[in-house]
């Protein structure tokens, strides 16, 4: 004798009301013309009731006959079992037809047992032209055993904004939930859901919600103990332990970044930035910027900024004494030491036929004469 197949009570109860609930889809091919279709596909139907056929809910833009008295039918509908956490629906707008939808309500009526149902699509949008899945989730909280009622209210409209016949459809369903236990428990207000996974409140994370979340994160080995609060190790302080508490002061503009450690500006070194990298100090206001390297102010140059700069220079008869000030050798003068004393007299033209000695001025007379203005010098 053949053994009869055993069905769960949920399946048997669904089978008992199939004649008034379900219109099986006869044409499994492409939807004809331009219209709207919504159905539970064969795979999902098999999971729910063990019957592998498409179940039409909306056909050719109209609600299926079993939905006409849906409230009466759902009173006999069994609760969704513990092991079923979601249900998939498939919908499609065929041809060029445009349909719009809105989930007016997704609400748990027993919030201590189940949270509000979820959907994987925006609550307001357009029905796609390609067959797509809409998943409705039933999030049991895992806090207690019980049956939760929940409401799904959706309206579908055509391109003119008119609701299709018999929508909005306001349906009440029931979901069986059971208390869950998470190994190790859930801390800091987290709760164990029916999948035995801790769901953590804002600010906590981890397998047991044992870790607090600090933004910005705790630095330098700090420990986040509650959201936004760090315990800092010795030597550090600040909201996120980003500041070092130096026992000694950093000199010369140094910055403390770690207990006993200073970041020194260029040219300085030492634990407290007290040492210059230049063995001999920079002169004339220069600053040490590296090992034996000075940055000189304008007007000076050289390794120690000891050499003044004269522009364009003092020529062959002078030396630069101060910035843009030349010290000329004896017999030379001028800003750049390029003018010679007595040069105009020595090179003046002699009268024709005159003797050299007769018309050459004596040294005493030459010394007694005033030099002409520098601008009249020939050089």
UniProtKB/Swiss-Prot annotation:
Induction description: Induced during the differentiation of CG-4 cells.
Gene Ontology annotations of biological process type:
positive regulation of fat cell differentiation; Wnt signaling pathway
Per UniProt, subcellular location reads as: Secreted
Q: Where does the record place the EGF-like domain? A: 178-210, 211-242, 243-274, 274-306, 307-338
PROSITE patterns this protein is in? EGF_1, EGF_2, EGF_3, WIF
Q: List the disulfide bonds.
A: 140-177, 182-192, 186-198, 200-209, 214-224, 218-230, 232-241, 246-256, 250-262, 264-273, 278-288, 282-294, 296-305, 310-320, 314-326, 328-337
Assigned keywords, A-Z? Developmental protein, Disulfide bond, EGF-like domain, Glycoprotein, Repeat, Secreted, Signal, Wnt signaling pathway
Region (Disordered) spans which residues? 348-379
Which residues, renumbered to this chain, are glycosylated?
88, 245
Q: Where is the composition biased (Basic and acidic residues)?
A: 356-373
Q: Chief localization class?
A: secreted
Position of the signal peptide? 1-28
Q: Record's Pfam families?
A: EGF_2, EGF_DL_JAG, hEGF, WIF
Its biological purpose is as follows: Binds to WNT proteins and inhibits their activities. May be involved in mesoderm segmentation.
Listed name of the protein: Wnt inhibitory factor 1
